C-alpha cells in the first residue's frame, strides 16, 4: 500500500525551494510546533523563525530554515510562504553565531531609541538557524 502524501510547496520571496509529495511537515507555528499530515484540517497561520522538517514520499527527511512566514493547509496541498528559506546545508554557522552575539549585545546595551522588536527578531532568526545546524549535526552523528 502506498504511503499517504500531500503536495507541499515551500517558496521564498526569490524562488521555489521545494515542491513535491510529503508524508509529514513540521514547522514552528505562532502557537508552538505544528505537524501537518495528509488529511489535516484546512488552516492558515503565521509561522515563526525556525526549522521546517519534511518527510518525503520515499521516507527521506529534509530540513530547512524558515525566517517566518505563512502556512496554508488545504485538503490537497500545503503551502509555506517565507521571506527567507535556506536548506540546512546552506546555513553559515559562523555568521549565525555572530548575528546572535550582535543581537544579544545590542539588547544588553539598549538606549532610549533602541528598537527592541528588531533586535529580538534578529536574535530569534539567528537562534533558529543555529538550531537547524545543531539538528543536522545530531542526525549526521547517528
Curated annotation (Swiss-Prot):
Protein source organism: Shewanella woodyi (strain ATCC 51908 / MS32)
Protein family (similarity comment): Belongs to the ATPase epsilon chain family.
Subunit structure: F-type ATPases have 2 components, CF(1) - the catalytic core - and CF(0) - the membrane proton channel. CF(1) has five subunits: alpha(3), beta(3), gamma(1), delta(1), epsilon(1). CF(0) has three main subunits: a, b and c.
Keyword Ion transport in annotation: yes
Keywords: ATP synthesis, Cell inner membrane, Cell membrane, CF(1), Hydrogen ion transport, Ion transport, Membrane, Transport
InterPro entries associated with the record: ATP_F1_dsu/esu_C_sf, ATP_synth_F1_dsu/esu, ATP_synth_F1_dsu/esu_N, ATP_synth_F1_esu_C, ATPsynth_dsu/esu_N
Function: Produces ATP from ADP in the presence of a proton gradient across the membrane.
Record gene name: atpC
Topology within the bilayer: Peripheral membrane protein
SUPFAM superfamilies tied to this protein: Epsilon subunit of F1F0-ATP synthase C-terminal domain (SSF46604), Epsilon subunit of F1F0-ATP synthase N-terminal domain (SSF51344)
Cross-referenced Gene3D superfamilies: ATP synthase delta/epsilon subunit, C-terminal domain, F0F1 ATP synthase delta/epsilon subunit, N-terminal
Location in the cell: Cell inner membrane
CDD domains in the cross-refs: F1-ATPase_delta
HAMAP family tied to this protein: ATP_synth_epsil_bac
Alphabetized GO MF terms: ATP binding; proton-transporting ATP synthase activity, rotational mechanism
Protein name, as recorded: ATP synthase epsilon chain
Gene Ontology cellular-component terms listed: plasma membrane; proton-transporting ATP synthase complex
Domain of life: Bacteria
Amino acid at each position: 500500500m502506498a504511503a499517504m502524501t500531500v503536495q507541499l510547496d515551500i517558496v521564498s520571496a526569490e524562488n521555489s525551494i521545494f515542491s513535491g509529495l510529503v508524508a509529514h511537515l513540521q514547522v514552528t507555528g505562532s502557537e508552538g510546533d505544528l505537524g501537518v499530515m495528509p488529511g489535516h484540517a484546512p488552516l492558515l497561520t503565521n509561522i515563526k523563525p525556525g526549522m521546517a522538517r519534511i518527510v518525503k514520499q520515499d521516507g527521506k527527511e529534509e530540513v530547512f530554515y524558515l525566517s517566518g512566514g505563512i502556512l496554508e493547509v488545504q485538503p490537497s496541498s500545503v503551502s509555506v510562504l517565507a521571506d527567507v528559506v535556506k536548506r540546512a546545508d546552506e546555513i553559515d554557522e559562523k555568521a549565525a553565531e555572530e548575528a546572535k552575539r550582535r543581537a544579544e549585545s545590542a539588547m544588553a546595551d539598549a538606549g532610549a531609541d533602541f528598537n527592541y522588536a528588531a533586535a529580538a527578531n534578529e536574535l530569534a532568526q539567528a537562534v533558529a538557524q543555529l538550531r537547524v545546524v545543531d539538528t543536522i549535526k545530531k542526525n549526521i552523528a547517528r
